A protein has these predicted regions:
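Active-site proximal loop and beta-alpha junction motif in alpha/beta enzyme cores
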Residues: 1-148
Length: 148
């Protein structure tokens, strides 16, 4: 999506909710690896593809309520790792811990998917071309005029 994040799988929804980042350390990590931040997620849920939390303190965003670019990237990550399939309509729940629950939607289409084995018998994923769409509803949180 053009904005790199560290994708961080978490075992359970309870573990995701317990995350309490060390924001200065996370800023240093983000700077070191030249990423926007960390996109923590779990597939341990029945109401969505994933529940997620996004942290980007390097950019003065301790936690983000809705992150389309990161969930678009998570869609592809899930596709590469087998928990999202071509043609899936995905639902990502984010912002709950901030009392600003958001639902981000994505859809993935792919062509040229071939799975096989290498000469060593290891799994090989040759995922060719993908198209990912991301969207959702929005609400106005603030309005105003800026005079220059």
């Amino acid at each position: 999506t053009g904005l790199p994040d560290i994708m961080m799988p978490v075992a359970s929804l309870a573990d995701l909710e317990k995350i309490s980042p060390d924001f200065p350390a996370l800023s240093k990590l983000s700077e070191k690896y030249q990423v926007v931040g960390v996109h923590a997620f779990t597939t341990d849920c029945d109401d969505a593809t994933c529940h997620v939390r996004n942290f980007a303190p390097l950019y003065d965003i301790d936690e983000e309520a809705a992150t389309g670019t990161s969930n678009g990237a998570l869609t592809y990550y899930g596709y590469l790792n087998g928990f999202i399939k071509a043609g899936d309509d995905c639902r990502f729940v984010q912002g709950e811990k901030m009392n600003r629950p958001s639902l981000i939607l994505s859809h993935i289409e792919a062509s040229g998917e071939e799975n096989g084995e290498t000469e060593n018998g290891e799994a090989e994923n040759n995922k060719a071309s993908c198209s990912i769409q991301v969207g959702g509803s929005a609400v106005i949180l603030a309005e105003g005029d800026i005079k220059l």
